[in-house]
């Protein structure tokens, strides 16, 4: 029978191996955690960068809208297209909105038709009619202090965007199935053909 001898070196060696394995596992876990933390930090940085870019774009948009609002004589065809796009019109609705403005005011923000015989007291780019009770309702609905507020081209276009449901219903301008005049559009189609595509 062999006598068992106590070998402290073997125990120390075993403990050292176990500690080394544990240290390696901890180091690997720390490396994974560091990598994940770096990924999260990078994602947060990217999100902040995108938010900053979106904010810069919004500031530029507001600044450009302010510039266009200061225009009082006549918007060029491209300025008009830009303004309508900035307030939300897009695609087919943008083209239709552009043609309607050209038909109604030829891009002149201070246009006014005060001919009560034709049922008009219409203002601005889209010639928004403010005659009689219609004016009272619209002043209240759109928080207008006076009809001449509609000479602001941005405000006028924003109200037209709302009235037309984003360009889906041009009935108030005599275009389409909901038109007050049965859809006779007159010069609308002439202007539609002159829309500045791709510019």
How should each PLM-predicted stretch be described?
Residues 20, 42, 47-107:
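Export/targeting segments at the very N-terminus of extracytoplasmic proteins
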Residues 102, 118-119:
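Flexible glycine/serine/alanine-rich "lid" or loop that lines and gates the nucleotide-sugar donor pocket
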Residues 108-110, 171-172:
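Paired acidic/hydrophobic, glycine-rich loop segments that form the ligand-binding mouth/hinge
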Residues 66-71, 82-88, 112-116, 142-153:
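Second-shell loop/turn segments in exported
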Residues 101-105, 113, 130-132:
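Generic secondary-structure microfeatures
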Residues 1-56, 60:
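N-terminal secretion targeting segments of exported proteins
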Residues 7-11, 117, 153:
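Hydrophobic alpha-helical transmembrane segments of integral membrane proteins
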Residues 96, 115, 123-199:
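Catalytic and binding regions of secreted/periplasmic enzymes and modules that target cell-wall glycans
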């Amino acid at each position: 029978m062999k006598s068992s001898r106590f070998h402290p070196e073997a125990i120390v060696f075993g403990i050292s191996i176990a500690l080394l394995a544990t240290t390696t596992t901890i180091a690997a876990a720390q490396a994974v955690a560091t990598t994940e933390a770096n990924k999260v930090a990078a994602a947060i940085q990217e999100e902040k960068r995108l938010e900053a870019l979106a904010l810069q774009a919004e500031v530029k948009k507001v600044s450009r809208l302010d510039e266009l609002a200061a225009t009082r004589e006549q918007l060029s065809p491209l300025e008009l297209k830009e303004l309508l796009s900035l307030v939300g019109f897009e695609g087919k609705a943008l083209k239709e909105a552009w043609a309607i403005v050209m038909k109604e005011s030829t891009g002149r923000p201070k246009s006014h038709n005060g001919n009560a015989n034709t049922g008009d007291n219409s203002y601005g780019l889209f010639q928004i009619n403010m005659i009689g009770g219609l004016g009272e309702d619209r002043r209240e609905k759109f928080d207008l202090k006076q009809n001449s507020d509609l000479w602001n081209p941005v405000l006028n276009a924003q109200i037209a965007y709302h009235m037309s449901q984003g360009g889906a219903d041009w009935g108030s301008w005599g275009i389409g199935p909901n038109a007050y005049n049965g859809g006779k559009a007159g010069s609308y189609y002439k202007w539609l053909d002159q829309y500045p595509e791709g510019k």
